[in-house]
């Protein structure tokens, strides 16, 4: 399976902590960074994993510390968003299963094993329905399908958990829509907005998996950094 991590961003919301270190390189313990943990868990549960990191901000620091992966560099990370990073990696979307992962996500081992590393036959996003307020990028659903994802929803089912799983056909459609958006100048968008465009324009069916029973977090504040450490150290203790 193909795993594409988006790690080009500057981590502005964590400044000044990210002035000298990408937030994906935040240390969860003496020997393990946030990104090293996620890459390691994927390799544990999918030994044949093909892992690609799309870098930008302080890319050389990441390249020095994460081995056994391939790298693609977005030189325009200062003025673009994740849709442009994925555009640079667009040829990687030609695969039977593609998992797109935000680079600031920490997940418990069981979630990686049971969900992240399982093949899909339809497009799926991960959602946490326990988050009903103050979500960053939120999801409204009907039945088993996603209606819309947006930062601007007043009422929603849950928060998007930073992971999209695609089968070959949905990856192909995603690539086509992403290319169209970038060509039209929408390189400042999140790549997930291409999925929303597909829903509205093409009757694209996007599904979701609710991960509310698993431990995970998106590292976007100092308080959440502490939660990420707790998830990591708890597993070390239990292991």
What is the role of each PLM region?
Residues 62-136:
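Conserved beta-loop-beta/alpha segment of the NTase-like Rossmann-fold superfamily
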Residues 1-29:
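Glycine-rich N-terminal loop/short-helix segment of MobA-like nucleotidyltransferase
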Residues 108-185:
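Conserved core of the sugar-phosphate nucleotidyltransferase
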Residues 24, 50, 70, 205-207:
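Conserved beta-strand segments of alpha/beta enzyme cores
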Residues 1-3, 142, 160-239:
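Conserved alpha/beta core of the MobA/IspD/sugar-nucleotide pyrophosphorylase nucleotidyltransferase superfamily
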Residues 9, 104, 221:
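Active-site glycine-centered loops adjacent to acidic/histidine catalytic or metal-binding residues
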Residues 13, 61-62, 110, 173, ...:
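Phosphate- and divalent-cation-binding pockets in alpha/beta enzyme and binding domains
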Residues 2-5, 13, 32-96, 184:
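Conserved N-terminal catalytic core of the sugar/cofactor nucleotidyltransferase
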């Amino acid at each position: 399976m193909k795993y594409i991590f988006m790690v080009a961003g500057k981590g502005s919301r964590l400044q000044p902590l990210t002035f000298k270190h990408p937030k994906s390189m935040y240390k969860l313990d003496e020997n393990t960074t946030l990104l090293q943990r996620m890459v390691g868990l994927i390799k544990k549960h999918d030994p044949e994993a093909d892992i690609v990191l799309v870098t930008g901000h302080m890319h050389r620091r990441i390249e020095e510390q994460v081995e056994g992966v391939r790298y693609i560099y977005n030189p325009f990370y200062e003025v673009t968003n994740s849709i442009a990073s994925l555009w640079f990696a667009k040829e990687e979307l030609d695969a039977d299963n593609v998992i797109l992962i935000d680079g600031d996500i920490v997940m418990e081992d069981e979630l990686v094993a049971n969900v992240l590393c399982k093949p899909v036959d339809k497009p799926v996003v991960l959602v946490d329905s326990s988050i009903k307020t103050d979500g960053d990028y939120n999801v409204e659903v009907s039945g088993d399908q996603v209606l819309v994802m947006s930062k601007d929803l007043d009422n929603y089912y849950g928060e998007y958990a930073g992971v999209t799983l695609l089968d070959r056909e949905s990856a192909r459609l995603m690539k086509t829509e992403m290319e169209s958006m970038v060509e039209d100048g929408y390189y400042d968008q999140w790549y997930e907005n291409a999925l929303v465009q597909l829903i509205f324009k093409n009757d694209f069916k996007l599904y979701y998996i609710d991960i509310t029973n698993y431990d995970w977090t998106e590292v976007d504040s100092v308080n959440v950094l502490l939660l990420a450490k707790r998830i990591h150290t708890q597993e070390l203790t239990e292991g």
